[in-house]
């Protein structure tokens, strides 16, 4: 107990835990709607699309200020989103295809730029590699405040437009009849996903950020059919994984926080898939076995 208290008294760990806690809460919440809308790959595409913006922001300004780099990430993510929409509306390529194109092209371009930076005299002070898999230990107090502020905004917007988001997610036509704009809700959800991705890339990285959006919702879906409960569970799973991953990585030297958070989330998702009521693998096996026995007795 004393060792745990001493661990949490560490200033760096306090920042990391608070940052990843709120990041997990917000990502789990907004990711629930993305999963229900079958847009899981969208978060993946946006997170990968942020990499070129991060590198370009550094090349243009010569600074590795978190605010500047995240601004570049946000602009690049928005460009990637616009490209996806244009591809879907002007070609016969479906949603998954458009998202896959953006994911591959932007990630490849980002790595090309990153290679260029690493070969330049500025490479030693760039520190851009941390955005690939994340480096939560570099989070400062101002970064934590930014994460908290953005995740609180996400939570408030979801609460404020709960009815509209719910209707547009499950029945777009009925939502339009009720006077709500499905397109507006889709735009808002897209913006929230971009915000969640941008504030999370420093801690989790562009490669793994999509897992923080989808895994909590996938795990929560195994336990409930209620949207309200699903969102609450997804936020809880995201927050727990953030705190757990931060503590574990702090205890083990040279262990990156982002991958550990994703591993914890993967464990939660696997347990949920196996043990979830009604949907769980074990429940389905037990149900089939029971039906088989009843048929044999009959």
Curated annotation (Swiss-Prot):
<feature type="transmembrane region" description="Helical">
    <location>
        <begin position="144"/>
        <end position="164"/>
    </location>
</feature>
<keyword id="KW-0864">Zinc transport</keyword>
<feature type="transmembrane region" description="Helical">
    <location>
        <begin position="97"/>
        <end position="117"/>
    </location>
</feature>
<dbReference type="GO" id="GO:0043190">
    <property type="term" value="C:ATP-binding cassette (ABC) transporter complex"/>
</dbReference>
<keyword id="KW-0406">Ion transport</keyword>
<keyword id="KW-1003">Cell membrane</keyword>
<keyword id="KW-0812">Transmembrane</keyword>
<dbReference type="InterPro" id="IPR037294">
    <property type="entry name" value="ABC_BtuC-like"/>
</dbReference>
<dbReference type="InterPro" id="IPR001626">
    <property type="entry name" value="ABC_TroCD"/>
</dbReference>
<dbReference type="GO" id="GO:0006829">
    <property type="term" value="P:zinc ion transport"/>
</dbReference>
<feature type="transmembrane region" description="Helical">
    <location>
        <begin position="187"/>
        <end position="207"/>
    </location>
</feature>
<dbReference type="GO" id="GO:0010043">
    <property type="term" value="P:response to zinc ion"/>
</dbReference>
<feature type="transmembrane region" description="Helical">
    <location>
        <begin position="255"/>
        <end position="275"/>
    </location>
</feature>
<feature type="transmembrane region" description="Helical">
    <location>
        <begin position="41"/>
        <end position="61"/>
    </location>
</feature>
<comment type="similarity">
    <text>Belongs to the ABC-3 integral membrane protein family.</text>
</comment>
<keyword id="KW-0862">Zinc</keyword>
<feature type="transmembrane region" description="Helical">
    <location>
        <begin position="16"/>
        <end position="36"/>
    </location>
</feature>
<protein>
    <recommendedName>
        <fullName>Zinc transport system membrane protein TroC</fullName>
    </recommendedName>
</protein>
<feature type="transmembrane region" description="Helical">
    <location>
        <begin position="68"/>
        <end position="88"/>
    </location>
</feature>
<dbReference type="Pfam" id="PF00950">
    <property type="entry name" value="ABC-3"/>
</dbReference>
<keyword id="KW-1133">Transmembrane helix</keyword>
<feature type="transmembrane region" description="Helical">
    <location>
        <begin position="229"/>
        <end position="249"/>
    </location>
</feature>
<dbReference type="GO" id="GO:0055085">
    <property type="term" value="P:transmembrane transport"/>
</dbReference>
<keyword id="KW-0813">Transport</keyword>
<comment type="function">
    <text>Part of an ATP-driven transport system TroABCD for zinc.</text>
</comment>
<keyword id="KW-0472">Membrane</keyword>
């Amino acid at each position: 107990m004393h060792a745990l208290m001493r661990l949490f008294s560490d200033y760096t760990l306090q920042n990391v835990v608070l940052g990843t806690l709120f990041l997990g809460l917000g990502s789990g919440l907004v990711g629930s709607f993305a999963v229900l809308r079958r847009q899981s790959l969208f978060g993946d595409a946006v997170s990968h699309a942020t990499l070129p913006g991060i590198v370009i922001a550094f090349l243009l300004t010569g600074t590795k200020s978190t605010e500047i780099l995240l601004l570049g990430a946000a602009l690049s993510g928005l460009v990637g989103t616009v490209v996806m929409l244009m591809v879907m509306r002007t070609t016969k390529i479906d949603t998954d295809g458009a998202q896959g194109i953006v994911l591959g092209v932007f990630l490849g371009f980002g790595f090309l730029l990153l290679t260029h930076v690493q070969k330049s005299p500025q490479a030693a002070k760039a520190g851009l590699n941390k955005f690939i898999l994340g480096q939560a230990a570099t989070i400062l107090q101002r970064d934590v405040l930014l994460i908290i502020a953005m995740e609180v905004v996400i939570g408030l917007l979801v609460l404020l437009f709960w009815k509209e988001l719910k209707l547009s997610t499950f029945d777009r036509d009925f939502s339009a009849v009720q006077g709500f704009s499905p397109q507006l809700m889709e735009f808002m959800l897209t913006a929230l996903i971009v915000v969640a991705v941008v504030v999370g890339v420093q801690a989790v990285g562009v490669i793994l950020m999509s897992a923080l959006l989808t895994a909590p919702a996938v795990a929560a879906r195994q336990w409930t059919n209620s949207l309200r409960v699903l969102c609450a569970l997804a936020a809880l799973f995201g927050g727990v994984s953030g705190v757990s991953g931060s503590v574990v990585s702090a205890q083990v030297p040279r262990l990156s926080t982002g991958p550990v958070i994703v591993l914890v989330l993967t464990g939660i998702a696997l347990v949920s898939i196996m043990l979830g009521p009604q949907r769980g693998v074990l429940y389905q096996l037990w149900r089939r076995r029971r039906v088989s026995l009843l048929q044999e007795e009959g």
